[in-house]
Amino acid sequence: MAEDVPQQSNRITLEKDSVAWAPCMLGENFNHGKKCSIGALAHIGRNVTIGDNCRIQGSAYIADGCVLGDEVFVGPNATLLNDKYPPSGDSKYWKPVTVESGAVIGGGSTIIPGCNVGKFSVLGAGSVLTKNIPENQVWAGNPAIFVMNRSEYESKREQ
């Protein structure tokens, strides 16, 4: 049996005071804001735009054309899809996901093509989102449903 061997992460310094950890995939025409962090094994597709102060955790998958606003958190193994009827191969059929500023995408969650996550909303870990989430709401489950307002969520976090 082989022994565990500690490995050093390879820090990739990006412009605008942002960082990615190798290995990861940063697609062609990827555009990021200031002070972003992208975890190891993340896949950021082509023509993806993410705003300032975003954090993409390891092994997250963000399909081509998706848009994330400022201060978005995407948990590990989260998946943002763009192709509702794969494999289309033709971007004119794609419906990229939009995640608005201040939103949180829990680890292991999946967002179906064309969905929008509203400002300051939360999608719980392991959820499957098939509808748009309005601003300031928390949704969870498979399929994801409304659970509470963001203000109630913040109150529970502080307890």
Each predicted region: which residue ranges?
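Flexible, glycine/small-residue-enriched loop-and-beta-strand segment within the central core
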Residues: 2-10, 22-117, 142-144, 148-158
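Active-site phosphate/pyrophosphate- and oxyanion-stabilizing loops and adjacent acidic/basic residues
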Residues: 127
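Conserved active-site beta-strand element of glycosyltransferases/polysaccharide synthases
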Residues: 139
